[in-house]
From Swiss-Prot:
Protein name: Uroporphyrinogen decarboxylase
Statement: the UniProt record of this protein carries the keyword Nucleotide-binding: no
Biological processes, Gene Ontology terms: protoporphyrinogen IX biosynthetic process from glutamate
Entry binding sites for substrate: R27, Q28, A29, G30, R31, D77, Y154, T209, H327
Species of the source: Escherichia coli O7:K1 (strain IAI39 / ExPEC)
Enzyme class, UniProt record, top EC level: lyase
Length: 354
């Protein structure tokens, strides 16, 4: 078993005792850091940065040099899987990700390959191996993927969407086609995450960014069902240690009980969910991650500390809390404010673990 100098994050996910509440930030390697912008400029564009193992490793490590974070997260993108299926991913200035060949019908789904993670997605595994080597056992490395539903929204809409009318039209008019796509994505994501674990990821997270746009019934059928399939198929132990799995549905606060039944180890919470309420509902079954509003990092340091204290008090004493933002850090947040946040979590949480 690889010895970790700091395993707080893994211990908290398994609801084991820790000295202070562990903390990391979604999108902690990102555009709010000047050093990230410099490395991205060196790479040329975003996907070139993802596909260069040395540069992906560099940006993964950048926030850890600035802040005493308790975990590193692989620098990559959720759209690597659809890209590897041949949909032609590109980035439009001001528009975000687009696909040249969106999925429009069952025939399109049937033509999609299930990517080999060590072949078409080998660059991701190279990045995982490189990061693990360079971390030198300081903190654990988190691997991740998008959820089948969230990946499908991009693949069917042809890119980002606000109303999700194209995929909802498929969902209601041709549910068979959408289920076929989601099933293929669930198989692909299971292989992809297991390959990340074998390459060295010590925990994994499934990001269901767009699950919250569904009705409760549709969420169960079209999102949660497929995440459950993935959890069932994941390697849960590697290198002599349990590999914890976190599910995060943005806007999914009303479905925590159902999410906790999947067999995952932890649930990510966005900032619209009260953490005390979440702990009452599912804290005996899973750990909780979250959940400060990312926009709070625009506030003065004293206000950030006040919010950290409030969330810590909401969760209360005992184990099973990983502090995080409720979604990704915004690109124009002052880096010093992120530092205030991380330091406050460690300092203010100690009394909750006595």
């Amino acid at each position: 078993m690889t010895e970790l100098k700091n395993d707080r994050y893994l211990r908290a996910l398994l609801r084991q005792p820790v000295d202070v509440t562990p903390v990391w930030m979604m999108r902690q390697a990102g555009r709010y850091l000047p050093e990230y912008k410099a490395t991205r400029a060196q790479a040329g564009d975003f996907m070139s940065l993802c596909k260069n193992a040395e540069l992906a490793c560099e940006v993964t490590l950048q926030p850890l040099r600035r802040y005493p974070l308790d975990a590193a997260i692989l620098f990559s993108d959720i759209l690597t899987v659809p890209d590897a299926m041949g949909l032609g991913l590109y980035f439009e200035a001001g528009e975000g990700p687009r696909f040249t060949s969106p999925v429009t019908c069952k025939a399109d789904v049937d033509k999609l390959p299930i990517p080999d993670p060590e072949d078409e997605l080998g660059y991701v595994m190279n990045a995982v191996r490189t990061i693990r080597r360079e971390l030198k056992g300081e903190v654990p490395l988190i691997g991740f993927s998008g959820s089948p539903w969230t990946l499908a929204t991009y693949m069917v809409e042809g890119g980002s969407s606000k109303a999700f009318t194209v995929i909802k039209k498929m969902m209601y008019a041709d549910p068979q086609a959408l289920h076929a796509l989601l099933d293929k994505l669930a198989k692909s994501v299971t292989l992809y995450l297991n390959a990340q674990i074998k390459a060295g990821a010590q925990a994994v997270m499934i990001f269901d960014t767009w699950g919250g746009v569904l009705t409760g019934r549709d969420y169960q059928q079209f999102s949660l069902y497929y995440m459950h399939k993935i959890v069932d198929g994941l390697l849960r132990e590697n290198d002599g240690r349990r590999v914890p799995v976190t599910l995060f549905t943005k806007g999914g606060g009303q479905w925590l009980e159902a999410m906790a039944e999947t067999g995952c180890d932890a649930l990510g919470l966005d900032w619209t969910t009260d953490i005390a309420d979440a702990r009452r509902r599912v804290g005996n079954k899973v750990a909780l991650q979250g959940n400060m509003d990312p926009s709070m990092l625009y506030a003065p340091p004293a206000r950030i500390e006040e919010e950290v204290a409030s969330i810590l008090a909401g969760f209360g004493h005992g184990e099973g809390h990983v502090f995080n933002l409720g979604h990704g850090i915004h690109q124009d947040v002052p880096p010093e404010h992120a530092g205030v946040f991380v330091e406050a979590v460690h300092r203010l949480s100690a009394p909750y673990h006595l």
